[in-house]
Amino acid sequence: MKIPKFEAQTEWNIPTEFPDLRQVDEIAIDLETKDPDLIKKGSGSVIGNGDVIGIAVATNHYKGYFPIAHEGGGNMDKKRVLSWLKDVLEAPSTKVFHNAIYDVCWLRAMGFKINGDIACTMIAAAVTNENRFRYDLNSLSWHYLGCLLYTSDAADDSLR
């Protein structure tokens, strides 16, 4: 069986504005990190090794990715992005993460205060079905949406 692949945009444009998201009910946030010692020593947010390299934000009416420390360039002004993110995180809206404990730990290590409820899709998946073998975003995407966010031979084999 061929597994359908999610067709992600391969080209993205740096946002040209910092939208005011303080009044929305829910905000999905995903941090892209460089965490070189995660497997051996644990989260870089705890051991002080690694970086947040980009921030993805989505609401019902907005989606954007804010690169701040990509090695290949194309980054936005980090201070401006983090100042905007501070306002977003301090708003009373619900913040939705996948593996919230990881991303929230990074945000707190960076000095951010997070107001509003924190929802975690990984925990929600475990509560919904405690007998699943995997709770990673790719596996859940396959289960609930019938598509993969990324493919590899290992991912294909584990889902068959």
Language model features by range: what are they?
Residues 146-147:
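Glycine-rich, acidic and aromatic/proline-enriched surface loops and short helix-turn segments
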Residues 150-155:
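Conserved small/polar residues in nucleotide/adenosyl-binding loops
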